[in-house]
Amino acid sequence: AIILGANMIGLMLYDLFNPAEPLKSQGKIDSRWHSLIDSLKLFGTVVIGTLCGFLFKSYLMLPTGINLYVLIVLIFFVGIQLRNNGISLKEAIFNKRGFQTGIVFTFTSLLGGIIAAFVLAMPITQGLAFASGMGWYSLSSVVLTNAWGPVQGSIAFFNDLSREIVSLFVIPLFMRHFRSTAIGITGATAIDCTLPIIQKAGGIEVTPIAISFGFVTNILPPLLLVFFSSIPL
């Protein structure tokens, strides 16, 4: 919560002092109530899916890895939309606002990790390591389990997984006025799991920001996690 809070404050300040241009791809501007409904729909879909998986696990035996293939198809169609709207791959990867959002996000994550370490009376390097996952729970949990054991690995897993869950609410609610906050709070998932949600909430024009931001937040976690977890406590 401390790391997420630091991200929110830092990214909202960035949005306030460096506001993005008004969205052009949305013909009708969504009201706050409509955005809240969209957030609840996304969260409700996750809850219903989880319940169905639990209640009907004997009947709903989906092929292993099908979620990955569905995600690949969704991202494939996002790529088609980018090209159809005249946005090149270079523009998507080297987007200035996306890169700046990634820097602000990384700095506030590490700052939040330091604050969390003081509040929870843990070593600073451990707080920095937990902050370095940036939403990449499948990576952070493995690295920190190998470094410090299953308890710390589980903490890293739930810490980063909670970011993805919070994103379901934040993206639709903040996209209109706090674009970098809406995208930045997703962390490393901006380039894969939450990319279709970002595109739906903000239109195709915000996709380059998400992709550029996602590249930053996918390159740094492996380096930072290994570095901080290798420092003796």
Language model features: what each stretch is:
Residues 2-15, 42-55, 73-80, 171-172, ...:
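Hydrophobic core segments of alpha-helical transmembrane domains in multi-pass membrane transport
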